[in-house]
């Protein structure tokens, strides 16, 4: 059975952030705390989005009045999955179990050689 790299995105709310950079750091740290120690192999990063006007890449963070919505990316290797769909289900289950109120969406599943 093949191995897969599954990429998920999540919407993370950060309250009382002083800046966009602060919100990104807090979101990654909070997500890391929820995943550790069981899933410390999951890579966490702030996602990117494209500017609707010029198409240049921007960090996926929106901040108003000290509250930020941060788009996080989780990368997880899933071993011995039956199919890409099965790998996505496993990753979503394992991460979602530790973050029950965080919306997760699969954005990519790639087979690892």
UniProtKB/Swiss-Prot annotation:
Signal peptide limits: none
Pfam family, one: DUF555
Recorded family membership: Belongs to the UPF0212 family.
Name under which the protein is recorded: UPF0212 protein AF_0282
Source domain of life: Archaea
